[in-house]
């Protein structure tokens, strides 16, 4: 800014006064006592020209400094945002976070991005508009025109408005054709159970993990374990009679309708007699028959109904609504979204659009299943040479709605698979309320190295942040005033005490106390909207700790 002002003034000065510097003489016209006087004497011009140049340079430096400082104060954020927007599309993958207190631009390089982000803040603190939206925008825009480098993303939206911004960001950089919106009665169909490459036990365990979302106290372990076993055996049967294609509708029928079960067993028995089953299928068939006929259907009616109700907490959503069934239990030939392999290989953007206030637990089920599918596919990259090394990202607003215990394992290992995890939640307590296990919450928090704290009233969050920033010696000063009197009388007229021969003393005590760098008032009162405390890494070391003014997406 200073250089621009300085050289502008220099060029202007040259254009206006060039003729004077090239002349050999100058005539002065001076008004003195209202008498016009024109001297004919030619003064020495070399000294005059040299003096004028020196004076101009000095005045130009002073003026340029004043102008540039005023402009910097008026538009610091605008200028930095312009730089952010231009640099965000550079060849290097990095995220611009905001401005430090010294107005320096803070960014995180690619190696630091793979150590994940945890963003917390109370409602209205600006965590979505100044952190989640800008970060999402930058990741979508990265190498948007390069089919080999653009990122593949999974974005979960349980409020129903995030995907609108995603579509806007994608359209602005020409990636609108990369968007896959998963929503009821939408253009894409998705079957969470169509995973032919996974064993039935793995799929059943994923379903149990999702069931835990509806068991906040985790007090139903026995029923959940039994439900997992029943689901595993039902998936085995369904794969055998339904050409290796499993849906929630088929699982629901096998579990709740004993006549439907016998019908399918009869069909498989016929195939067995015709020698159309492989050895693996015969083993799975015998295992399923033994479980259902000797354990499941042999239970007393009350126990059986409890176990059925545990399983149908998931399956009922898919059989009771036509639009839901059409979208998430389609026939194989109508299946349009077949998983995250293409997302990773081609750089697609998958967005879930299901408002949790409208779809309740169904939104949690689909969100959690998309997340688990994405995590499984990402980790498969480590064991396969067929995958590209394209970076991918998982972005989740209101993460506490579908946090699962297995997430900590993924966050700890996803760095090697080049996955950027950015999650947002109101507080650590909201995660604790969902998992009901403080140690599991602490492990998840530990594996999200980059932390951004907006204004918060949550004690758990504040205390954890204070410990993260550490302590330092603080000087505490206390003033004490005292008054002593030899004789004090009470005045009944003025209702006051009158002292005689009194003296006043003052003492000042200074002490050093080892205390937190940021006290609780800083988190609850001092932090402004769109400002945050950050703990950031570049992948090798912690590079920045302190206050940052964020970049709201609308500025």
Map each language-model feature to its residues.
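Short regulatory helix/loop adjacent to the ATP-binding pocket of P-loop NTPases
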Residues: 166-170, 431-446
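Basic- and hydrophobic-enriched, low-structure N-terminal and domain-boundary segments
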Residues: 1-125, 129-135, 142-148, 500-507
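Conserved H-loop
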Residues: 424-430
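Conserved P-loop NTPase motor module
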Residues: 310, 475-555
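Conserved P-loop NTPase catalytic core
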Residues: 438-479, 483
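Switch/connector loops and helix/strand junctions flanking conserved nucleotide-binding motifs
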Residues: 162-165, 187-192, 430-434, 460-465
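Alpha-helix capping/termination and helix-coil
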Residues: 374, 378, 382, 403-406, ...
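P-loop NTPase motor domains
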Residues: 73, 78, 100-104, 108-419, ...
């Amino acid at each position: 800014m200073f250089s621009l002002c300085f050289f502008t003034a220099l060029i202007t000065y040259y254009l206006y006064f060039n003729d004077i510097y090239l002349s050999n003489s100058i005539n002065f016209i001076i008004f003195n006592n209202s008498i016009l006087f024109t001297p004919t004497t030619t003064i020495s011009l070399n000294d005059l020209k040299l003096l004028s140049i020196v004076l101009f340079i000095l005045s130009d430096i002073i003026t340029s400094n004043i102008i540039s400082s005023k402009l910097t104060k008026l538009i610091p954020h605008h200028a930095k945002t312009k730089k952010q927007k231009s640099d965000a599309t550079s060849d290097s993958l990095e995220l611009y976070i905001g401005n430090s207190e010294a107005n320096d631009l803070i960014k995180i390089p690619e190696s630091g991005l793979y150590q994940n982000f945890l963003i917390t803040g109370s409602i209205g603190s600006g965590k979505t508009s100044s952190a989640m939206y800008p970060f999402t925008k930058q990741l979508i825009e990265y190498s948007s025109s390069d089919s080999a480098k653009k990122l593949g993303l999974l974005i979960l939206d349980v409020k129903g408005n995030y995907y609108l911004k995603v579509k806007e960001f994608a359209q602005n950089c020409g990636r609108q054709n990369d968007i896959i919106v998963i929503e009821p009665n939408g253009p894409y169909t998705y079957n969470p159970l169509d995973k032919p490459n996974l064993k039935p036990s793995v799929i059943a365990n994923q379903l149990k993990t999702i069931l835990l979302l509806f068991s906040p106290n985790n007090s139903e372990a026995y029923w959940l374990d039994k439900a997992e076993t029943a689901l595993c055996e039902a998936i085995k049967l369904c794969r055998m009679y339904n050409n290796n294609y499993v849906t929630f509708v088929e699982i629901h029928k096998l579990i709740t309708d004993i006549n439907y079960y016998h019908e399918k067993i009869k069909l498989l028995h016929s195939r067995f007699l015709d020698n159309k089953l492989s050895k693996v299928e015969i083993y799975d068939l015998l295992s399923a028959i033994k479980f259902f006929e000797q354990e499941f259907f042999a239970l007393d009616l009350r126990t059986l109904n409890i176990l059925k109700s545990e399983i149908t907490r998931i399956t009922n959503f898919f059989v009771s609504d036509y639009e839901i069934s059409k979208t998430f239990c389609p026939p194989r030939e109508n299946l349009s979204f077949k998983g995250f392999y293409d997302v990773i290989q081609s750089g697609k953007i998958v967005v879930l659009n299901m408002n949790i206030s409208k779809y309740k637990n169904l939104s949690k089920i689909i969100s959690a299943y998309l997340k688990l599918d994405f995590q499984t596919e990402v980790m498969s990259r480590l064991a396969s040479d067929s995958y590209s090394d394209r970076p991918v990202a998982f972005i989740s607003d209101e993460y506490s709605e579908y946090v699962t215990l297995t997430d900590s394992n993924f966050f700890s290992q996803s760095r090697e698979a080049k996955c950027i995890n950015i999650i947002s939640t109101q507080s650590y307590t909201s995660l604790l309320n969902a998992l009901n296990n403080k140690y599991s919450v602490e492990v998840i928090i530990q594996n999200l190295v980059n932390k951004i704290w907006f204004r918060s009233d949550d004690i758990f969050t504040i205390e954890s942040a204070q410990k993260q920033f550490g302590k330092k010696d603080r000087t505490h000063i206390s003033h004490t005033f005292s008054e002593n009197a030899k004789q004090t009388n009470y005045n009944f007229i003025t209702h006051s005490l009158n002292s005689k021969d009194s003296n006043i003393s003052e003492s000042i005590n200074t002490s050093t106390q080892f205390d937190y760098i940021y006290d609780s008032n800083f988190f609850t009162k001092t932090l402004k909207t769109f400002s945050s405390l950050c703990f950031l890494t570049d992948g090798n070391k912690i590079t920045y700790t302190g206050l940052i003014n964020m970049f709201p997406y609308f500025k």
